[in-house]
C-alpha cells in the first residue's frame, strides 16, 4: 500500500522566554491556521468518500507535502506523516495490469516459440530441397558422363558407318555440293552487276548466262535415263520405285534447276540496254521474276511427294493403303494452305509491278541549290533529283536502291513506303524447297 508523507510546518515551541512573552491572540491565530491546513490536507487525502475502508496495507504510497503557514515563523520544521491507505480502484488496476502483463508475456512467448518452430521447419525444408537438388544434379551429371563415355567408345564404329553411308551416296553428296557452290557464285555475281548499274559488265552477265545454262544441260544429260526434267512440268520421272532418298534426290535437283533458270532470265534483263529498259523498271522485273520462281517451286514437288505417299499402301493391306491415301490428302491440304497464305503477298507484288509507285516528285533547281546540289547518299551532284514528302532531296537511283531494303527516309526516318521491295536488287532466295 503506498505511503503518503506529509511535510507540514511544526507548531511554534513554547520553550523560549521570548516566545512566552508574545501576545496570546497571535499565538492562538497561528495555531488555528495550522489546524485548518491539516484538516484540509486530510480531507483531500481521504476523498472520494467511502473508499477509506478498503485500504490495502501491502502497497504503500508516499506523498511528500509541505505546507507553509501564512504567519511569520522564524523557526519551522517538517512533519512527515505516513498514511498506509490506497483506494480499491488502484489495487484493482494494479492487479489487472499484472494479469495483462502476464497474459501478454505468455502470448509473446507463444508467438516467439511458434516463430522459432516455423523457422526451424523452414530451415529443415530448405536443407532437404538443397539436398534433393544436389542429388538430381549429381545424377544428371553422372548420366551425361556415361553418355559421353559411350560415345567415346562407339566413335570408331560411328566413323565406320559414316564412311559407308558417304560411299553409298557419294554421287548425290558431290552433286549437292557442286549445285550449292554454283548457286552461291551466280547469285553473288548477279547482285554485284545489278548494283553497278551502268558500270555493269556485259561480258560477265553473258558468262553467267552460259554458265547456268550449261550446268543445267550437263546435269540432265548425265542422268537422262531417269528423266529428271519431267518434274519441271509436273510429271513423274521414269523410276520404278520411289524411296525416300530418291524423292529427296529428284526434288533437290529440280529446285536448283529452277533457280538457275530464273537467274538466267535475270541475266538477260541485265543485258538489255538502259535506254530500252531503265534501271528502275529492271528492279521491278527482278522482283516479279523472284516471286514467280518461289511460287512455281512451291508446286513442283507435289506430284513426286504425292506418288511417294500413295505408294506406301500399294504393297500392303487395306489399312496401309488407307493410311497412304490419308497422308497424301493431308499433304495436299497443307500445300493449299501454304499457297493461299502467300497469295496476298503475290497480289501486292503484282500491284507494285504494274503501278510502279513513285516515292516523291521532281525537285526544282531552287530546291536543289538550297542543299548545295549535293545528294546526301552518293555525295555527288543530283541526277534526277526527287523531293520526298519530308522535304529531303535525293537522286532517283539512290532512292531506288535505298527503298529496296528500307521504308523510311535516310535522314529523318519518316515512313515513305509501306512495303520493302526485297528482291529488286536481283537476289535469289537460298531456301531449298524440298517438300
Swiss-Prot record:
Primary localisation category: endoplasmic reticulum
Polar residues bias locations: 40-62
Pfam families from the UniProt entry: zf-RING_2
GO BP annotations listed: positive regulation of ERAD pathway; protein autoubiquitination
Pathway membership, UniProt: Protein modification; protein ubiquitination
EC number assigned by the record: 2.3.2.27
SUPFAM superfamilies cross-referenced by the UniProt entry: RING/U-box
TM region(s), chain numbering: 158-178, 203-223, 233-253, 256-276, 298-318, 323-343
SMART domains documented for this protein: RING
Function: E3 ubiquitin-protein ligase that acts in the endoplasmic reticulum (ER)-associated degradation (ERAD) pathway, which targets misfolded proteins that accumulate in the endoplasmic reticulum (ER) for ubiquitination and subsequent proteasome-mediated degradation. Protects cells from ER stress-induced apoptosis.
Name of the protein in question: E3 ubiquitin-protein ligase RNFT1
Annotated source species: Homo sapiens (Human)
Organism lineage: Eukaryota, Metazoa, Chordata, Craniata, Vertebrata
Primary gene name: RNFT1
Amino acid at each position: 500500500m503506498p505511503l503518503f508523507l506529509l511535510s507540514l510546518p511544526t507548531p511554534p515551541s513554547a520553550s523560549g522566554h521570548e516566545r512566552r512573552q508574545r501576545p496570546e491572540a497571535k499565538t492562538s491565530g497561528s495555531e488555528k491556521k495550522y489546524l485548518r491546513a491539516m484538516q484540509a490536507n486530510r480531507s483531500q487525502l481521504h476523498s472520494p468518500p467511502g473508499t477509506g475502508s478498503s485500504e490495502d496495507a501491502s502497497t504503500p504510497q508516499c506523498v511528500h507535502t509541505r505546507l507553509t503557514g501564512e504567519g511569520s515563523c522564524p523557526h519551522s520544521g517538517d512533519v512527515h506523516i505516513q498514511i498506509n491507505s490506497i483506494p480499491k480502484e488502484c489495487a484493482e488496476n494494479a492487479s489487472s495490469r499484472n494479469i495483462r502483463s502476464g497474459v501478454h508475456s505468455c502470448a509473446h512467448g507463444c508467438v516467439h516459440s511458434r516463430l522459432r518452430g516455423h523457422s526451424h521447419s523452414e530451415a529443415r525444408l530448405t536443407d532437404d530441397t538443397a539436398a534433393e537438388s544436389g542429388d538430381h544434379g549429381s545424377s544428371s551429371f553422372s548420366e551425361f558422363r556415361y553418355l559421353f563415355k559411350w560415345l567415346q567408345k562407339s566413335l570408331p564404329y560411328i566413323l565406320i558407318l559414316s564412311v559407308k553411308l558417304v560411299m553409298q551416296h557419294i554421287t548425290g553428296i558431290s552433286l549437292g555440293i557442286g549445285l550449292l557452290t554454283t548457286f552461291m557464285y551466280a547469285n553473288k555475281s548477279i547482285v554485284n552487276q545489278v548494283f553497278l548499274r551502268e558500270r555493269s559488265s556485259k561480258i560477265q552477265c553473258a558468262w553467267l548466262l552460259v554458265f547456268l545454262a550449261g550446268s543445267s544441260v550437263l546435269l540432265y544429260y548425265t542422268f537422262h535415263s531417269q528423266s529428271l526434267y519431267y518434274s519441271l512440268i509436273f510429271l513423274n520421272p521414269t523410276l520404278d520405285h520411289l524411296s525416300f532418298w530418291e524423292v529427296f534426290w529428284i526434288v533437290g535437283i529440280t529446285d536448283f534447276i529452277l533457280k538457275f533458270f530464273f537467274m538466267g532470265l535475270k541475266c538477260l534483263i541485265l543485258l538489255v540496254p538502259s535506254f530500252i529498259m531503265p534501271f528502275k523498271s529492271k528492279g521491278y522485273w527482278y522482283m516479279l521474276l523472284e516471286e514467280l520462281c518461289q511460287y512455281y517451286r512451291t508446286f513442283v514437288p507435289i506430284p513426286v511427294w504425292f506418288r511417294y505417299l500413295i505408294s506406301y499402301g500399294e504393297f500392303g493391306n487395306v489399312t496401309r493403303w488407307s493410311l497412304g491415301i490419308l497422308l497424301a490428302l493431308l499433304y495436299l491440304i497443307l500445300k493449299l494452305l501454304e499457297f493461299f497464305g502467300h497469295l496476298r503477298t503475290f497480289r501486292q507484288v503484282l500491284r507494285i509491278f504494274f503501278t510502279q509507285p513513285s516515292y516523291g516528285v521532281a525537285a526544282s533547281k531552287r530546291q536543289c541549290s538550297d542543299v548545295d546540289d549535293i545528294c546526301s547518299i552518293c555525295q555527288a551532284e543530283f541526277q534526277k533529283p526527287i523531293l520526298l514528302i519530308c522535304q529531303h532531296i535525293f537522286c532517283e537511283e539512290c532512292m531506288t536502291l535505298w527503298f529496296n531494303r528500307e521504308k523510311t527516309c535516310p535522314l529523318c526516318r519518316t515512313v515513305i513506303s509501306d512495303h520493302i521491295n526485297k528482291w529488286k536488287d536481283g537476289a535469289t532466295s537460298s531456301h531449298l524447297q524440298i517438300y
